[in-house]
């Protein structure tokens, strides 16, 4: 065998990739006995491959190759995650459209067409980096088999009463206009203003409250001071008038107010964060919802109606300054939760969503994790910390066009849930009438 004078990686890699395919080296043979399965989440069809793809999936490939070297029958298929929010955002970008401006049927067809146009090149990218999957058996998360599997899982959870629908404040992305789960969040450091503003007491005296979110002044429903904070004990039980918007709010004693943060006085709004949600539920207060689902202010915000959140923030700060209600303003950097898909700061909006019961089953998840062999072992601890840190049940519903539909209907008369029969799966409730009655 003659070796070339100069190694050409492109020629060599393509040669051996073709050899692997022709020889069927990576094909799964169901007739062999000892099977080692690699159950990997399929990569999202959301554009070109990047270094992060290669880094994470090469680790799985190392394991698959190791077990082949041990003469085990490796079951390692290649799939594509080509439904849901990432795919919708890609289609909107490539085709310069907005899903909210199209009918569901039109947009779904456009998504399917776009995926068919780009999928071959996407899969070839994975072949070209040398992934040792069985590419003769690919799957898609939007194919009938996967839809059926997903819908069957939902029905199983529904029968076990592990899934429920509930209207409550939940995390919301105003850019993508959908509810999101805690697992969809990322921390991001952003520039902001930390401002001190005057609230007026009944005797026209002023108290100062610090906030980074003046756009929520219209949503303020009460004020907290710490019971041991001597500066403000005399305020407990009194009312204060919110600057610019003039609604009167009660001042409560509560230990969640941190005397060392800002001015030590905390305004509770509907809804700035999960602590606001807890406080409003605790006091059974009537929320003042000022944000729309697309991230604009509504009529409760008065003259700021129809401004987006950032525009309103700027205008309100300017008006506070004009009215001599702005005590202080300083530039800061702080960590905020953003939606991992688009980088937009998340809000809390009251919407009706489906949830899987996570919080009441935390111990079960941790015990299940202990039965797994973790490599390296510290990843088990990371998993446990992640479970312990979950503070919300898992929101699984999304307000999108292109995805797996819930196999349910709602009775128009009584709003009862009508569940599809497992034999009907996969099913699209928007185009199919229920066989059962409520």
Model-identified regions with their sequence ranges:
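Glycine-/acidic-rich phosphate or pyrophosphate-binding loops and their flanking alpha/beta elements
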Residues: 25-27, 194-200, 248-257
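Acidic, glycine-rich two-metal-ion catalytic cores of nucleic acid-processing enzymes
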Residues: 211-215, 432-438
């Amino acid at each position: 065998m003659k070796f070339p004078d100069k190694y050409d990686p492109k020629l060599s890699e393509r040669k051996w990739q073709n050899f692997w395919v022709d020889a069927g080296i990576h094909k799964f043979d169901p007739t062999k006995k000892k099977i080692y399965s690699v159950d990997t989440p399929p990569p999202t069809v959301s554009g070109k491959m990047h270094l992060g793809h290669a880094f994470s999936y090469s680790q799985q490939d190392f394991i698959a190759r190791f077990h082949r070297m041990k003469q085990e029958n490796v079951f390692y298929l290649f799939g594509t995650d080509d439904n849901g929010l990432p795919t919708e955002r890609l289609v909107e970008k490539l085709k310069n459209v907005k899903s909210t401006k199209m009918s569901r049927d039109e947009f779904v067809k456009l998504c399917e067409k776009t995926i068919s146009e780009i999928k071959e090149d996407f899969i070839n990218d994975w072949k070209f980096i040398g992934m040792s999957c069985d590419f003769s058996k690919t799957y898609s998360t939007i194919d009938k088999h996967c839809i059926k599997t997903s819908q069957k899982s939902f029905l199983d959870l529904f029968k076990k009463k592990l899934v429920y629908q509930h209207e409550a404040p939940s995390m919301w992305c105003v850019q993508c206009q959908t509810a999101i789960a805690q697992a969809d969040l990322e921390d991001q450091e952003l520039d902001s203003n930390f401002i001190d503003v005057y609230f007026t007491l009944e005797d026209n005296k002023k108290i100062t409250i610090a906030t980074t979110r003046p756009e929520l002044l219209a949503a303020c429903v009460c004020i907290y001071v710490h019971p041991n904070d001597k500066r403000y004990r005399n305020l407990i039980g009194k009312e204060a008038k919110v600057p610019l918007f003039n609604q009167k709010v009660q001042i409560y004693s509560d230990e969640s107010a941190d005397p060392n943060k800002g001015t030590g006085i905390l305004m509770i709004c509907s809804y700035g964060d999960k602590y606001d949600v807890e406080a409003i539920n605790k006091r059974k207060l009537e929320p003042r919802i000022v944000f729309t689902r697309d991230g604009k202010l509504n009529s409760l915000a008065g003259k700021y109606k129809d401004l987006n959140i950032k525009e309103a923030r700027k205008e309100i700060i300017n008006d506070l300054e004009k009215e001599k209600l702005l005590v202080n303003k300083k530039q800061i950097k702080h960590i905020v939760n953003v939606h991992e898909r688009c980088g937009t700061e998340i809000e809390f909006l009251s919407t009706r969503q489906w949830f899987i019961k996570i919080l009441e089953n935390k111990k079960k998840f941790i015990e299940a994790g202990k039965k797994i062999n973790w490599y390296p072992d510290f990843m088990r601890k990371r998993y446990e910390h992640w479970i312990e840190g979950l503070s919300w049940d898992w929101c699984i519903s999304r307000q999108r066009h292109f995805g797996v539909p819930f196999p349910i209907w709602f009775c128009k008369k009584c709003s009862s849930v009508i569940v599809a029969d497992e034999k009907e799966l996969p099913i699209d409730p928007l185009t199919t009438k229920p066989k059962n009655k409520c």
